[in-house]
Regions:
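N-terminal secretory signal peptides that target proteins for export/translocation
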Residues: 1-2
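Bacterial N-terminal signal peptides
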Residues: 5-16
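PEST-like low-complexity, intrinsically disordered acidic/proline/serine-rich tracts
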Residues: 17-271
């Protein structure tokens, strides 16, 4: 089994049972619906009461973020977003800006064929990887705070909008610490303060505790969200890595709780 096949297999086992774990057929009244009961996802992007772009809703990462069939189909039939599998999918192998120690660790992760993947042991996926997992997440928007609730492991993150400064040398966390600001209709989020225990993707690209993630959220229209992700980690990579993950609104579904430890049946096979 090669490294990519192993990564896809691990991902399939982790998410096959949760692929349709939403509260279905409860329509979102904040968007328009056609006479035949379908959501109008191409109408203009809504505005919040304060005039900012409204990012609220339940979103599902798209498998083909560049508009081409580049997602990888898992053994369960779920199409995995390409950046969940590989954040460097747009780069040639020789152009990945590894530092030597990072490249050595990445090769070690590849050789493990998924058994060392933190999510295979029910540890959090972390940021930005949660935005590429084929499970829904909900954005709740308020003037001074945006909360993102993820179905995967029922975790959440807070993005503070009141001008809060990111502290130096904070207590390391899986999700980091996020502060955001508006650039016209784009929400720009800076997140720092990570531990170094998560992987950036399922192939095993590592990061250090110096990771700085910059996300630019833009709602293109009612039904489509684009998140430009920049990974800036000077300890691990010689220059930033950027990709764009897209998501589609799922206006007639909601989240259900999901805990990996409650469903886990696979760790014994990695021993």
């Amino acid at each position: 089994m090669n490294s990519i096949t192993a990564a896809v297999a691990v991902t399939s086992l982790m998410f096959a049972a949760q692929a349709s774990a939403q509260w279905v057929k409860y329509p979102d009244s904040s968007i328009q619906w056609t006479r035949d009961g379908k959501p109008n996802l191409s109408e203009g992007a809504p505005k919040a009461r304060d005039g900012k772009a409204d990012l609220s809703g339940v979103w599902l990462p798209e498998p083909d973020p560049n508009g081409t069939p580049q997602g990888v189909e898992s053994i369960s039939g779920t199409v995995i977003p390409r950046y969940m599998l590989d954040i460097t999918a747009d780069l040639k192998p020789e152009d990945v800006p590894f530092r030597p120690s990072t490249e050595a660790l990445f090769k070690q992760h590849l050789q493990s064929q998924g058994k060392d993947d933190p999510i295979a042991h029910c540890q959090p996926t972390g940021v930005p990887g949660l935005g590429a997992i084929p499970l829904p997440y909900k954005i709740i928007q308020m003037p001074r705070l945006i909360a993102i609730l993820y179905e995967e492991n029922s975790v959440f993150r807070q993005i503070f909008l009141e001008g809060r400064r990111l502290v130096n040398d904070p207590e390391p966390r899986w999700m980091g610490y996020s502060s955001g600001k508006w650039d016209r209709d784009t929400l720009v989020v800076d997140t720092v303060g990570f531990n170094d225990r998560s992987w950036l993707d399922r192939l095993g690209h590592p990061h250090s505790d110096a990771l700085h993630v910059i996300e630019r959220f833009r709602r293109r229209d009612a039904g489509h969200l684009e998140i430009e992700v920049t990974i800036d980690d000077p300890k691990a990579y010689t220059k930033p890595i950027t990709y764009t993950q897209k998501a589609t609104l799922v206006p007639d579904e909601d989240l259900l709780e999901y805990f990996c430890s409650e469903n886990e049946k696979d760790v014994q096979h990695y021993k």
